[in-house]
A protein has these predicted regions:
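Generic protein-terminus/edge-of-domain signal
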Residues: 1-73, 79-80, 88, 114-115, ...
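Short hydrophobic/aromatic patch on the recognition helix
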Residues: 71, 225-230
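Ligand-binding loop in jelly-roll beta-barrel domains
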Residues: 79-102, 112
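Double-stranded beta-helix
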Residues: 102-123
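Short, Lys/Arg-enriched, Trp-marked, Pro/Gly-tolerant hinge/linker segments that flank
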Residues: 127-138, 152-208, 212-219, 232-237
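Helix-turn-helix DNA-binding motif, specifically the short coil turn and the N-cap/start of the second
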Residues: 222
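Single conserved hydrophobic/aromatic residue that forms the stacking wall/gate
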Residues: 244-253
Length: 253
């Protein structure tokens, strides 16, 4: 997985929650077929696994941008802002799994959830993981995601039980390999919360006309610091963000 950062225009959108009857959701997407060739910045109440089936794209999370290729993937914790966009002339097909925490344990007061899962998902620095085949435990996780793909492509009665099995197995390996020693700085934590807040605000007030000064005032920041907040977290200016938000193209993932 090559690492790179650069700027391009991307947008965000409100994501619908999973159905109350669904414990997970699987969708295959083509970055070239999406509006503006972009997976719009958003976050979810569910865990996400992203696996690249073919090609290459740019994936953005936590002020970083990655060039992710076929056979590589990501894990995203709940509430993590992320996005993706086409890279140069490359096509890219990828699969997204949205996983409800109830797949692991029905209730959060389950002792095993409290012991193994809660410390990870609640840790401020644990936002995402990259998966590359050259790292043995990550390669094993990627193989399990491929098996999940095969099962979802040809589902039979009981296939959800197999998916649940693989998800639990994946979290076992994440638990044994994730490093929770790093602490998120106060500035990073404040940035993330402020970014979510302003994204919700702009979405709810989409029918109103906003200026940089309006957005900065809502964030309780100067104009220049507001611009830096947007560039750090979604790699675009507030003006470009608002302009793209008002476009009539909405992508439903």
């Amino acid at each position: 997985m090559n690492y790179d950062i650069y700027h391009s225009s991307i947008t965000y959108f409100p994501l619908l929650p999973l159905s109350k009857t669904a414990s997970f959701e699987c969708k295959v997407l083509d970055i070239r077929q999406m509006p503006a060739q972009v997976l719009f910045p958003h976050w979810d109440d569910e865990f996400e696994f992203i696996y690249v089936l073919s090609g290459m794209m740019e994936f953005r999370v936590r002020q970083k941008a990655f060039l992710v290729s076929s056979g590589e993937g990501f894990f995203l914790n709940t509430g993590e802002i992320h996005s993706a966009c086409a890279y140069q002339s490359y096509d890219c097909r990828f699969v997204i799994y949205r996983i409800c925490p109830s797949v692991l344990f029905q209730t959060e007061d389950n002792p095993l959830y409290q012991k193994y899962i809660k410390p990870m998902v609640d840790h401020p620095s644990f936002g995402f993981l990259t998966f590359v085949p050259k790292v043995p435990w990550q390669k094993y996780i990627l193989e399990m995601i491929r098996k999940m793909n095969d099962i979802c492509e040809r589902p039979v009665d009981g296939y959800e039980l197999k998916i649940n099995h693989f998800i639990n197995e994946i979290f076992y390996y994440i638990f044994h390999n994730v490093n929770l020693s790093k602490e998120l700085s106060l500035k990073e934590s404040r940035d993330l919360e402020r970014m979510k807040d302003v994204m919700i605000y702009l979405t709810k007030t989409i029918d109103q006309k906003h200026t940089l000064a309006d957005i900065a005032s809502y964030c309780h920041l100067s104009n220049s610091e507001c611009c830096r907040l947007f560039q750090r977290n979604v790699h675009l200016s507030p003006a470009v963000s608002y302009t793209h938000l008002t476009l009539p193209t909405i992508c439903s993932v």
